[in-house]
Regions:
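Glycosyltransferase specificity loop/lid
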Residues: 1-95
Length: 95
């Protein structure tokens, strides 16, 4: 199963997901973690593949950038897991 994991760049949101991503991989899933460029090392800890987008100081711009990046690759995935502040995740998953 191909899983797209979408998160925003906040340590308190990302670090708790590392174990979940590792478990998904252990169960045979191929996980791609979508995060801003600069977070490659954190994603590498989970063993997921990294997909990047441009970071921004404003949350609204982070969400727009994450959505634009996800929209480019979403069709490759069977499942999308997204964090609570990425409210466009539901719309993305319904496409």
């Amino acid at each position: 199963m191909q899983v797209l994991f979408i998160n925003l760049p906040y340590y308190g949101h990302v670090v708790p997901t590392i174990g979940l991503v590792q478990e998904l991989i252990a169960q045979g899933c191929e996980v791609t973690y979508l995060m801003p460029f600069g977070w490659e090392d954190i994603v590498a800890e989970s063993k997921a593949q990294f997909a990047g987008y441009q970071n921004h100081k404003q949350l609204s711009e982070q969400i727009k950038n994450a959505y634009a990046a996800a929209e480019q690759i979403v069709e490759r995935f069977d499942m999308i897991i997204y964090e609570q502040f990425f409210f466009l995740g539901k719309h993305l998953a319904e496409q």
